[in-house]
UniProtKB/Swiss-Prot annotation:
Its EC number is 5.3.1.23. The active site is at residue 253. Belongs to the eIF-2B alpha/beta/delta subunits family. MtnA subfamily. GO terms for molecular function: S-methyl-5-thioribose-1-phosphate isomerase activity. It is found in: Cytoplasm; Nucleus. The gene is mri1. PANTHER family: METHYLTHIORIBOSE-1-PHOSPHATE ISOMERASE. Catalyzes the interconversion of methylthioribose-1-phosphate (MTR-1-P) into methylthioribulose-1-phosphate (MTRu-1-P). It holds the Pfam family IF-2B. This is Methylthioribose-1-phosphate isomerase. HAMAP family: Salvage_MtnA. GO terms for cellular component: cytoplasm; nucleus.
Amino acid sequence: MLQAIKFSKGNLEILDQLQLPFVEEYIPIRTTEDGWHAIKDMKVRGAPAIAIVAMLALAAELTSAVDSDKLSQSPEEVCQYITEKLAYLVTSRPTAVNLADAARKLEAVVTDCTKAPGSTGHEVATAFIKAAEDMMGKDLEDNKRIGHNGAEWIAIHAAKGNSEVAVLTHCNTGSLATSGYGTALGVVRSLAEKNTLRHAYCTETRPYNQGSRLTAFELVHDKIPATLITDSMAAALLADTKVGVNAIVVGADRVAANGDTANKIGTYALAVLAKYHGVKFLVAAPRTTIDMATASGKDIVIEQRAASEVTSIKGPRAGSEATDQIAIETVKIAAPGINVWNPAFDITPASLIDGIITEVGVVEKGADEKYHLGGLFDGSTF
């Protein structure tokens, strides 16, 4: 399984996803500024991975300060420093709720440590570092549970009596988008491990091509039977009875309290197609992605990306992969002067979602045809 995030003894390295799948290069992240730019520039992406890298970037910076004895001994000063850095990191990707959620949780950790009698600046920093490391470990555990829960649900509700299923996924939600294993792609991995996956299909996911560059890369790496399609081929794929897609499984950057889901642009279109073709549509996400403070999708801020992502494309020159020197080039593909609208995400209404796969189980709509996600947090749902 791919490892996109490496953290050991205060040293953080991430796999530069802008160069994948042609070049595998790990880049060091030593400061919060390094982490902020890596997230903003999409060298790392995927809601869980963004949160983990942001927290570990600050952990790496704090480790360096502790080791060089440059950290204030005042717990209040260290707490304030951490709080300001967390606020800065959250601005790198505002749509992904995991980042803000992680910042709130770790801010609470350092605040509690600061209030403890006799605490020191060193202890406050150490508490943050440990909490960030623990967060990474828990994410991996949660992902494997999500994969298992989703695979079990699909076998019961979407297989239609078949021993194997075909699944379509969108964007990248695997090891490259999380601490490891993945959310929606984790469901695909779990199906493959259980020998119940007939075939996986992935969209290229324009305009940033996370599907063709990253998901396809992971599927090939893990030797999972898979086929790449363009985004515009999805309807034809679902209509093809010979293919027989059983379910569409996607990730999420934010799930509102009513189940409305913000995810990579194109997700909404897939949900509409799934409803028309009678294909199950599932969202796979840890509970940290569910924002009970956001009532519906109308309240979610959608990030607008640069026009250049649509009007140009990056990759090596054809044939250069046969050499040791691979240079990533940018090629223009649109008419000069054309206006561009480039939202990074869209909102899929809860009414189009058949189930939300979490680490504690799969939530379905109630008798009133609405999601009641509060039970995921008070233990009443499962």
